[in-house]
C-alpha cells in the first residue's frame, strides 16, 4: 500500500515496541560514548525519533539509562541464571555477551565509571562474589584465599568475556573452555601450598 505521494505509509509502533526501539538505540549510543557524553538528542538520532517522543517514554536521561541497565540485567539473568554456578554458567555468560555486546559492556564496563549508577554494578559484584564463595567453599578451605578467589573469579570472568568481545569473539566454540581454564587456575592458586598445615 502506498500513499498519494508514492511513499509507503509509516507504521506506528505499539508503545512496547517503541520502548524497545528506544532502549536498543540508547544501548548503542551509551555504549559508544558513555553516559555523560551521550545526550538525549544522540539517542533520538540513533532511534530516528524526536526528543519529544523520547520524553513520552522516559522522564530523563537518567531514567532512560536506568531502563537500559535494568533490561541488560534482566536479559543476563534470563540467560545465565542468578543463584548458582555450574558447567553451563560460562557458556551462558558468553552467549549473553555475544547476543548483546553493547549491553554487556555497558553493564560491566561503563556503569562502574558512573557514580550515579555505581550501586547497580556493586550489587552485581557482591552477589557474584557470594555465589563464587558458596561454590568455592566445596573446594577451597575457609580463609583469606577463599575470599581472594571469591572476589577474583567473577571479576576475571567478566573481564575475560569483555576481552573476548573486544577481540572479535574468536573461536566461539572453545571460548568457554578457555575462560574455564582461567577460572580453574585461580582455584588451583587458592589451594593450600603443599606441606602447609
Give the label of every model feature segment.
Residues 32, 66-92, 132, 137:
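Amphipathic alpha-helical linker/stalk segments
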Residues 47-58:
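Short hydrophobic/aromatic patch on the recognition helix
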Residues 115-140, 144-155, 174-177, 181-188:
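Amphipathic alpha-helical packing segments from all-alpha helical-bundle domains
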Amino acid at each position: 500500500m502506498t500513499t498519494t505521494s508514492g511513499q509507503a505509509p509509516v507504521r506506528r509502533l505499539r508503545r512496547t515496541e517503541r520502548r524497545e526501539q528506544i532502549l536498543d538505540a540508547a544501548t548503542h549510543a551509551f555504549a559508544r560514548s558513555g553516559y555523560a557524553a551521550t545526550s538525549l538528542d544522540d539517542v533520538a538520532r540513533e532511534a530516528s525519533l524526536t526528543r519529544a517522543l523520547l520524553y513520552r517514554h522516559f522522564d530523563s536521561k537518567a531514567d532512560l539509562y536506568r531502563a537500559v541497565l535494568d533490561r541488560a540485567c534482566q536479559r543476563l539473568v534470563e540467560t545465565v541464571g542468578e543463584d548458582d554456578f555450574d558447567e553451563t554458567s560460562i557458556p551462558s555468560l558468553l552467549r549473553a555477551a555475544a547476543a548483546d555486546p553493547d549491553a554487556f559492556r555497558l553493564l560491566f564496563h561503563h556503569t562502574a565509571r558512573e557514580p550515579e549508577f555505581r550501586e547497580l554494578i556493586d550489587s552485581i559484584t557482591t552477589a557474584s562474589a557470594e555465589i563464587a564463595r558458596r561454590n568455592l567453599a566445596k573446594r577451597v578451605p575457609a580463609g583469606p584465599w577463599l575470599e581472594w578467589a571469591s572476589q577474583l573469579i567473577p571479576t576475571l570472568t567478566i573481564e575475560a568475556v569483555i576481552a573476548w568481545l573486544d577481540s572479535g569473539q574468536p573461536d566461539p566454540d572453545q571460548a568457554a573452555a578457555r575462560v574455564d581454564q582461567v577460572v580453574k587456575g585461580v582455584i588451583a592458586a587458592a589451594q593450600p601450598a603443599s606441606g602447609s598445615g
